[in-house]
From Swiss-Prot:
The gene is RHOF. It holds the Pfam family Ras. It comes from Homo sapiens (Human). Plasma membrane-associated small GTPase which cycles between an active GTP-bound and an inactive GDP-bound state. Causes the formation of thin, actin-rich surface projections called filopodia. Functions cooperatively with CDC42 and Rac to generate additional structures, increasing the diversity of actin-based morphology. A lipid is attached at C208 (S-geranylgeranyl cysteine). This is Rho-related GTP-binding protein RhoF.
Length: 211
């Protein structure tokens, strides 16, 4: 059995079609499930229901390639810290999400999610996602934040965290208004395919050296 995080050399399910496994992590309630549901099913969940482990499937075209995305939602709550690593096996890419209106979820990118992902998915590319960008203009949400002497997380703060965790990309989106949702998964697929190609080249190089 492959170790968690090993770059999976997934067999293509059909001529010219690639298959990728992408795991999405982040604090509970940060917008992971909404992002996945809007992208794969076209529906935005109006009520919050914590996920345990769910799998969604979608297709995306990258260049001339048809790519099947197997998208794994995970539970962000501490109760599932021991179970969540099971999702990481044979992952091609990890999306780390946070809520731009929840500074704690942003802090946890560095405190919790980056250490966990790099431990279980060594060498696997990451993409950082700032979710719920529509709420930056929500007066009630802003009032609540400022009452606690807090401010929304800015785009530049997101870029800074991306650099600190050495993620391949930083992207922002609003699942509710479908803003940048398709871009998130198209760009994630590009990053994963590029990493796969690099891993395959390195494998060939090692074989040549052995021969």
């Amino acid at each position: 059995m492959d170790a968690p995080g090993a770059l999976a050399q997934t067999a293509a399910p059909g001529p010219g079609r690639k298959e990728l496994k992408i795991v999405i992590v982040g604090d509970g309630g940060c917008g992971k499930t909404s992002l996945l549901m809007v992208y794969s099913q076209g529906s935005f969940p109006e009520h919050y229901a914590p996920s345990v482990f769910e799998k969604y499937t979608a297709s995306v075209t990258v260049g001339s390639k048809e790519v099947t995305l197997n998208l794994y939602d995970t539970a962000g709550q501490e109760d599932y810290d021991r179970l969540r690593p099971l999702s990481y096996q044979n992952t091609h890419l990890v999306l780390i999400c946070y809520d731009v209106m929840n500074p704690t979820s942003y802090d946890n990118v560095l405190i919790k999610w980056f250490p966990e992902v790099t431990h279980f998915c060594r060498g696997i590319p990451m993409v950082l996602i700032g979710c719920k960008t529509d709420l930056r203009k929500d007066k009630e949400q802003l009032r609540k934040l400022r009452a606690a002497q807090l401010e929304p997380i800015t785009y530049m703060q997101g870029l800074s965290a991306c650099e600190q965790i050495r993620a391949a990309l930083y992207l922002e989106c609003s699942a509710k208004f479908r803003e940048n949702v398709e871009d998130v998964f198209r760009e994630a697929a590009k990053v994963a395919l590029s990493a796969l190609k690099k891993a395959q080249r390195q494998k060939k190089r090692r074989l040549c050296l052995l021969l």
